[in-house]
């Protein structure tokens, strides 16, 4: 069971585990004025890692085994495939021959799992916190599904921005599977960072990042998209409802060549059938273009004059206008 509690103008209580009337609950901030309470069956692990993050795995009554970082839900067994398939497959199916892929973040292994369904030759994954990988492999192994043992993986434990700043390699696709924009992670959602990523992309390639919920975190979403729009010649937004995120989640794409909604339908269906037929739980060619079909109010929101996320003025989670 999940209880949505709108608490305004009161200050939201601190997030985390709560014992209320003999019930173990998890309180999560879902926005600047919204919190959720979820029934907890069991706490599987809780660790303050060497990277300075609180990493928890919790068995939730509704969503099953779930990963929290700094009290924010990252993935659940119930619906992680919606997020990961939307992040990965529109991106890689837009490419004729995706040889090299870079994932920044992605320590839960879900994006890696989906990338490895494609005929890629090499995947570089740069994760800040090794403990995230170890925790998921131990407590939620269904998500990576053995992907960290794939010989095509080149795993780097380190700062994603520093890697991009010093990287001399080129990639067909760059997938930013990040924690939400708070703390040091805001540096991975700025115009300056996207400009550095752009230099790593081969001709014909593209970048994708999740860009927050389109309702509860509207301003954050707008500012991230604006930064991408001002960096790349081509840009697009997809959205998919992810129940555990309490919102329609946005995915922003940037390219100097082609973005997924511009992909020819015949090519899309052929590539899907050759690479992925029977291997997805959410994504299908029939919904590809629907993911990019935005209602009028969101199209209008993307045209509003908002400041792009920059190093000097980064977008942050739960930002308000």
Curated annotation (Swiss-Prot):
One of its GO terms (cellular component) is cytoplasm. Its main location: cytoplasm. It catalyses: S-adenosyl 3-(methylsulfanyl)propylamine + putrescine = S-methyl-5'-thioadenosine + spermidine + H(+). SUPFAM superfamilies: S-adenosyl-L-methionine-dependent methyltransferases. The active site is at residue 177. GO terms for molecular function: spermidine synthase activity; thermospermine synthase activity. It holds the Pfam family Spermine_synth. Catalyzes the irreversible transfer of a propylamine group from the amino donor S-adenosylmethioninamine (decarboxy-AdoMet) to putrescine (1,4-diaminobutane) to yield spermidine. HAMAP family: Spermidine_synth (MF_00198). Homodimer or homotetramer. This is Polyamine aminopropyltransferase. It comes from Korarchaeum cryptofilum (strain OPF8). The gene is speE.
